[in-house]
Each structure stands twice: as structure tokens, then as C-alpha cells.
């Protein structure tokens, strides 16, 4: 069953791996933190598998097997380096701008496990804060995805019922979040998330380019 396009009033986007490709800058920042701790570096593909669960989870996995267990300090180091290298190589995925702007008749929001301040900095630097009616980051609430509390908050804020909401993301975490909130879900296959896990999460839609949302929801 497909959502009735006229009924959809709120589109909720994940950030990393959905709207922007941040992998290179995240990888460099993780490795700078690891270097400062005199630990081995990790490849981009390894770190790619760690993105999506928030900074604490990212560094917890990056430290796995090293014997170093001060995750809080590692997160502090990562945050410092990432703040310095946030926009070195980060860029929008193809067709992101035009697709989000196409849905200007709906509410467009971001719901990510990334700290909200980093999201805001990237959007402002890329001159694309204006289309989004709200930004929820991993530190905006006491919970993070896949907990659906953020979606519940957004539905209350914009006076939407679940059938009026579409959650778009590149990971199984995003799809699980949407399903737990009872909203429509759309997976994007071009992002950073594990493609097999994304498929197995069984989103209502699966697209290989964000612009395909326009045809799905026309």
C-alpha cells in the first residue's frame, strides 16, 4: 500500500548518508582522535559501518579491541577534531537541494543522531537551512533513534497523524524508528548504511536517488 500523496504533510529526513555525504570528514576526525590516543587508524569503509548511532556509539566501536576504554574522552577528542574539519569534504548528495525544495508545500524536517549544532553548521555553511522547519539532533532529546520519541514530538509540533508522515533514511535504524512511530518509511540505497540491513528492515519504499521521491509522491 502506498501513501496517498495529498495526505502527506511532513517529510522527515535523516542527515548523514541521506542528505549529505559526511563520511570523509567523519573518518578523518575519528582517525585524528585515535592518533592522539596513540591508537591505530581505521579505513573509511570500517568507519562507514559505525556511522548512524551517534558519536558515543561511533567512538565506542572505533575503540573496540584497542584496550582503551575512556570513551567519554575519545568522544571529546572526536568532537574537537570534527568541529575543525566539519566541512573539508562534506557535500550534498546529487539532487538533494532540488528535491527538498520541490516539497516546499510540505513541512521538511531533519531528525538525526548527529548533534544538532553540527547539523546547523553544515546547513548554514552550504546555504540550505531555509527549507527545513525543524532540526532534531542526537542531543535534542534524552533519547536517540531508533527510539521514536523524536517523531512523536514532530507529529505533535506540526499537528500530524502518522499516516501523514514519511521518514526517509539510509539505515535500518531510520526505518525501525519510522515503523515504531507508525509512519511511512523510505530507504535510500545510495547512503552510508548497510544495504542488506536496510533491505531487511523492509521500508515501504526504496529509492536509489532522492529525486525519485518526486515521482513517488506526485
Regions inferred by a protein language model and the residue ranges of each:
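Asp-based, Mg2+/Mn2+-dependent phosphohydrolase catalytic module
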Residues: 1-9, 45, 120-218
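Active-site neighborhood of HAD-like aspartate-dependent phosphohydrolases
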Residues: 2-49
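Short, acidic loop-to-helix structural element flanking the phosphoryl-transfer center
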Residues: 7, 84-110, 116-120, 148
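An amphipathic alpha-helix signature
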Residues: 27, 31, 44, 48, ...
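Helix-loop "lid/cap" segments that line or gate small-molecule binding pockets
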Residues: 33-34, 54-68, 122, 154-155
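Short helix-capping segments at alpha-helix termini
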Residues: 35-40, 66-69, 127-131, 159-160
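Metal-dependent phosphoesterase signature
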Residues: 60-101
